[in-house]
């Protein structure tokens, strides 16, 4: 499965959650405006940041085991896989009671150049979006589902 390197979190604790203005285009969430159109790649920190490491909305969640980058396609594919499993397992009960929160946002643009292009002439055009994920960060939260259904959806 896509989320093999992530854990299921079950403790209910309150945390601060920052909200960003996002735009949705073709099932992709990305920031409405950024200060610059192109950013540097940067490095992912190895440590654990205190923000976003505790559940804030639901009863269950997925927690990252290590730091890294998640593309907007991976976030959307995981969200669709989780929702699809709940729809199959719980039929109409999930539509009435269940809810999923996506706690990560792909907010950093990634640039790329076409293949077989000579070196130089700038950085390239933005091709996609990524999210930097630190160790211990909550990625998805779920509510209105049982613990067994949540475990099956994430494995």
Curated annotation (Swiss-Prot):
GO terms for biological process: mitochondrial translation. It comes from the Eukaryota. InterPro entries: Ribosomal_uL16, Ribosomal_uL16_bact-type, Ribosomal_uL16_CS, Ribosomal_uL16_dom, Ribosomal_uL16_sf. GO terms for molecular function: rRNA binding; structural constituent of ribosome. The keyword Ribosomal protein applies. It is found in: Mitochondrion. Pfam families: Ribosomal_L16. Keywords: Mitochondrion, Ribonucleoprotein, Ribosomal protein. GO terms for cellular component: mitochondrial large ribosomal subunit. Belongs to the universal ribosomal protein uL16 family. This is Large ribosomal subunit protein uL16m. The gene is RPL16.
């Amino acid at each position: 499965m896509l989320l093999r390197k992530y854990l299921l979190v079950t403790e209910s604790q309150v945390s601060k959650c920052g909200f960003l203005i996002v735009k949705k285009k073709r099932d992709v969430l990305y920031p409405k405006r950024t200060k610059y159109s192109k950013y540097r790649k940067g490095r992912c920190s190895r440590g654990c940041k205190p923000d976003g490491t505790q559940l804030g909305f639901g009863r269950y969640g997925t927690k990252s085991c290590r730091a890294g980058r998640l593309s907007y396609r991976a976030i959307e594919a995981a969200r669709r896989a989780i929702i699809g499993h709940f729809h199959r397992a719980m039929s109409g009960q999930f539509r009435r009671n269940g809810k999923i929160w996506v706690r990560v946002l792909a907010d950093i643009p990634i640039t790329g150049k076409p293949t077989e292009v000579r070196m130089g002439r700038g950085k390239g055009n933005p091709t996609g979006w990524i999210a930097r994920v630190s160790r211990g960060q909550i990625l998805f939260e779920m509510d209105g589902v049982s613990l067994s259904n949540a475990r099956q959806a994430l494995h």
